[in-house]
Amino acid sequence: MSSSSWLGCLLAVLLSALALSQGLPLLEDLDENSFPDGRIVGGYVTDIAQVPYQITLRYKAISSPENPFRHRCGGSIVNETTILTAAHCVIGTVASQFKVVAGTNFQTGTDGVITNVKRVIMHEGYNSGAAYNNDIAVLFVDPPLPLNNFTIKAIKLATEPPLDGAPSKISGWGSTYPGGYSSNQLLAVDVPIVGNDLCDLDYENFIDETYHITSAMLCAGKRGVGGADACQGDSGGPLVVRDELHGVVSWGNSCALPNYPGVYANVAFLRPWIDAVRAGL
């Protein structure tokens, strides 16, 4: 191989490594046996009764059938048979690789209600036009979840975008710091909505032009301050404003950085697709 070819290959590897280290979806890929004390970044311990729409989506690889199902992503209960999560949580998988656990404060263990995923429908426009664009998927489960309005409850889907600056709540079992261990106990954090125009400016020089904010996304975070955010393991989970599901945890530059708000799938914008899938269209 010529020196110029070798240098070209090296540059490609370095650029790939840079991309993988920054614009990652907030997907869990950690050792589930290690849970240090701490919080979701900048957040607090919560109880499932405060966020009864929250589920843990557990997964195992087809190549390792002997392994237990383990937390991969979060999700939200739409009704007793329907869960909303992120497309990047389910891409390249089949339904039998997942179980949904509702009504639990913990990402491990057998408490709560466990049900099977029977069908996975990922947005056909995922990653089209921008990285992580249309990052949403619908899961159908069976047997149906026993909704009880206390620890297992459906959440209303937004039909209008939230106001800039509106307070929102994110919950999940994600890392308590970038690249750190996930939390075994359910955590939550409160962050304001950031307008898409400002958020797009923040990500203007991030990696390359494929990383930009589209209408199918919304942003939230303490802009210019940081310190509060979703993180790895929170993917697919809920962002809630005034008791309505407005966002699905999607991606960002690391976690809780002051100049990079977290990015979420925009439920109100994607609502026609969600409704069509639920109607079987």
Swiss-Prot record:
Residues 40-279 form the Peptidase S1 domain. Residues 1-23 form the signal peptide. InterPro entries: Peptidase_S1, Peptidase_S1_PA, Peptidase_S1_PA_chymotrypsin, Peptidase_S1A, Trypsin_dom, TRYPSIN_HIS, TRYPSIN_SER. Disulfide bonds join 73-89, 199-219, 231-255. SUPFAM superfamilies: Trypsin-like serine proteases. It is found in: Secreted, Extracellular space. Its EC number is 3.4.21.4. This is Trypsin zeta. It comes from Drosophila erecta (Fruit fly). The gene is zetaTry.
